[in-house]
A protein has these predicted regions:
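Gly/Ala-rich beta-loop-alpha elbow adjacent to hydrolase catalytic centers
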Residues: 34-38, 42
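Helical cap/lid subdomain of alpha/beta-hydrolase-fold lipid enzymes
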Residues: 47-176
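Short beta-strand immediately N-terminal to the catalytic nucleophile in serine-hydrolase-like folds
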Residues: 32-34, 85
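Short, charge-rich binding segments
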Residues: 22-25, 35, 73-75
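Active-site catalytic motif of lipid deacylating hydrolases and related acyltransferases
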Residues: 1-30
Length: 176
């Protein structure tokens, strides 16, 4: 949402995916299955459907603009069950030791940056952080813009979300 994007310094919208079940709506409950970090994502989706995001609602009141119905909550009749497979609900020690270390993030982000240029056909899914070269942008301009991305210093990423600290924050937000 807009509040989240403003808080962490990235674009509000990233890549958009077409829904797999286009007729999903309140009253038509579905069963969701998530593997690994997908289990965390599903749990947070259910939290938003049920309770919304007070932070997003307040931001919209103060700044105007549109707000997704997802952030308004009140949809506790959309998910029948959640099944998670190999989901690190309490984080992983590997993520604590390596996953969120600067050197690991740097290698991963350097790879992503190099694949975000106009000539690459690889989509690393980080366009919200500016890791996609614009059509009117030179390679030098792109590299300079990427250097200034807040991605390099944020905890708003999967590396952090898989740590025991990151999952503790998620667990406090969800009813699990």
């Amino acid at each position: 949402g807009a509040a989240h994007a403003a808080k962490y310094g990235h674009d509000r919208y990233g890549k958009t995916y077409a829904g797999a079940y286009r007729d999903w709506k309140p009253g038509q409950k579905i069963h969701l299955i998530g593997h690994s970090m997908g289990g965390q994502t599903i749990r947070y989706l259910e939290e938003l459907l049920r309770h919304g995001s007070p932070e997003e609602v307040e931001y919209q009141k103060q700044h105007g603009g549109d707000i997704s119905p997802l952030y308004k909550g009140g949809q506790d009749n959309m998910i029948s069950s959640i099944t998670t497979i190999a989901t690190p609900h309490n984080g992983t020690h590997a993520a604590d030791l390596l996953g969120n270390e600067e050197i690991i993030r740097q290698v991963a982000y350097d790879y992503a940056r190099s694949k975000g240029n106009k000539l690459s056909h690889v989509d690393v899914g980080l366009s919200q952080w500016g890791l996609k070269q614009r059509e009117d942008e030179t390679l030098a301009q792109y590299i300079q813009r990427v250097k200034q991305s807040k991605l390099w210093t944020t905890k708003d990423n999967g590396f952090y979300d898989l740590t025991t600290e990151g999952t503790d924050i998620l667990n406090q937000k969800t009813l699990a």
